[in-house]
Amino acid sequence: MRIQQSALLLLLLAVTSQGDAESNWNDKIKVFTVATEPTDGYTRYIRSARVYDIEVTTLGLGEEWKGGDMQKPGGGFKLNLLREAIAPYKNEPETIILFTDSYDVIITTTLDEIFEKFKESGAKILFSAEKYCWPDKSLANDYPEVEGKASRFLNSGAFIGYAPQVFALLVDPIEDTADDQLYFTKIFLDETKRAKLGLKLDVQSRLFQNLHGAKNDVKLKVDLESNQGVLQNVDFMTTPSIIHGNGLSKVDLNAYGNYLARTFNGVCLLCQENLLDLEETNLPVISLALMVTQPVPFFDQFLEGIESLNYPKEKLHLLIYSNVAFHDDDIKSFVNKHAKEYATAKFALSTDELDERQGRQLALDKARLHQSDYIFFVDADAHIDDGEVLRELLRLNKQFVAPIFSKHKELWSNFWGALSEGGYYARSHDYVDIVKRELIGMFNVPHVTSIYLVKKTAFDAISFKHKEFDPDMAMCESLRNAGIFMYASNLRIFGHLVNADDFNTTVTRPDFYTLFSNEIDWTEKYIHPNYSLQLNESNKIQQPCPDVYWFQIVSDAFCDDLVAIMEAHNGWSDGSNNDNRLEGGYEAVPTRDIHMKQVGLERLYLKFLQMFVRPLQERAFTGYFHNPPRALMNFMVRYRPDEQPSLRPHHDSSTYTINIAMNRAGIDYQGGGCRFIRYNCSVTDTKKGWMLMHPGRLTHYHEGLLVTNGTRYIMISFIDP
């Protein structure tokens, strides 16, 4: 029994001693990286280390980069910095050196796990491995063979090893501009040196994952509740601890990085970090650049959104660029009205003959001239619905950040989640969830357009020139190449995109024609602001006469635009019984009118009846349901003393009729109104934008009262004839 107890005690002591030793090893891991500038990539790397309590020593910060062009072979400068930094540990066999790049690396686990994976490899020095032999492809056949889909070739972006061996690895001199990967490759391919130093490659990506050429080898697994992600190598079912976006894989790394290193924990943690505290007495100076590069509907509402910005205008330098003659007059009127409110206010119109690239460059140059802290680009298709958008973007404290805007009921938005091989749009795995706000946060994306805020530290990186790409795509490519992250936030709904497809500026009042493509904006502009209140059962419906209901339905803009459309068309009927627009060619109760079919608005008006008239009808006439409403006759009537001043008594060929007043009684005309003969009840004080709704045939025999002066317009529909 004592022997068993003694053996058990020895075993416990051994386990404890081993655990202490491993803990000591963990304490002696020294992590190094090289970064001469605190780029967005470096900030991300340091954050990923911090969340796993990893202390990193950064070499070269604030120094001039001497390693040559980062897009070409080079990087010996890194090794010279590292050699000097680890020299104090060269005789410490228990010290472990972990080196990684920083601008394109993310750490995803603790040092404990990193140490365990290194120990399991059996190497003295373990390098990351990749799919391509670079920079000297001729050396590929000299590498040892690997099995299956393993990565065969050394990558210098990350390695780990015992300090004496790592120092010995770096003992040979290298020029600052020589290639670090080639330096390590030649040592690895020397079998004698490889054996002496205990060099191995992490060919199955147990510790390190290089992404270039490995897109199909990895899968991002995201927990549906927390939104925390891990990157798995599906070929070997490993979960690498250090992810390196080498070569052309940086866009992929950015996409994965949105979920790695605890950026989420049910909510977006990244969105809560390093926020800017806005001091009202010292707010940043902003250049507000409005870009009008195509004809867009609801331009007046776009300008209203700009005016709604909750930011001191004396801190805003306004520039409006337009290459669209259709909008020039509105721009001039806006600037003339508001110029004195802004720090400066200028415009460049279509007559200045600047193309879009020149217009955007002009805005950026003006921002430099004004020494602005930021430039806020807003294209005319981006409608701001929340005036806090600028302040909220500033608080996120990024070099480049955009609110996510999308078209109503569409997946079309102002960002791309991924790129095709040619640099164009590709749909990312999370794009739909982000646009629908089923996933809420701030995301590093490869392309943004329409509305974005840029910090002055990124101004010099921006180029709008490109042989193939439009200015927005050129800008995004230049920012990607400079390592500046483009963040897109859907933390709040700040606005939306209007749909400018098929916007026809050749028709009168073209906004009116866009109900199907821009339902939100059309409703906001053309439906009465009190409309929805009338759908509440507690809201009492006005009845000026028995079973004649009175509703606020459309805005002044609806009335004015529709009257303008009709008058521009000018195809008023002659008021006789002969009417070739009707089947049979005969009108029993003729009026001077224009049918909606004549101005291309029949389909739109039927949709208007379904969306806005039908819900009111169902409130007024309980128990009658007919969806969609059917109306063969939708027309505007014009009454004038010298044309047709009144209308004789008649029944309408409808189940119910609507009559919308299109202008102002007592101001635009005198007299007029409608008399319901059976009830001897008249409505003469009609109100612009208000609708009378009454039964058609049988009960509501009525007449149009005499207009004595001016012109009266009404919009009539005979519904469900």
UniProtKB/Swiss-Prot annotation:
InterPro entries: Collagen_mod_GT25, IPNS-like_FE2OG_OXY, Nucleotide-diphossugar_trans, Oxoglu/Fe-dep_dioxygenase_dom, Pro_4_hyd_alph. 2-oxoglutarate binds at residue 712. GO terms for biological process: collagen fibril organization; protein O-linked glycosylation. Glycans are attached at residues 504, 530, 536, 680, 709. Its EC number is 1.14.11.4. GO terms for cellular component: collagen-containing extracellular matrix; endoplasmic reticulum; extracellular space; Golgi apparatus; perinuclear region of cytoplasm. Disruption phenotype: RNAi-mediated knockdown in follicle cells results in round eggs. Collagen type IV protein vkg accumulates in the basal cytoplasm of the follicle cells and is likely to cause the distended ER region in the basal cytoplasm. One of its GO terms (molecular function) is procollagen glucosyltransferase activity. Disulfide bonds: none annotated. Forms hydroxylysine residues in collagen type IV. Required for the secretion of collagen type IV (vkg) from haemocytes, fat body and follicle cells. This is Procollagen-lysine,2-oxoglutarate 5-dioxygenase. It comes from Drosophila melanogaster. The lineage of its organism: Eukaryota, Metazoa, Ecdysozoa, Arthropoda, Hexapoda.
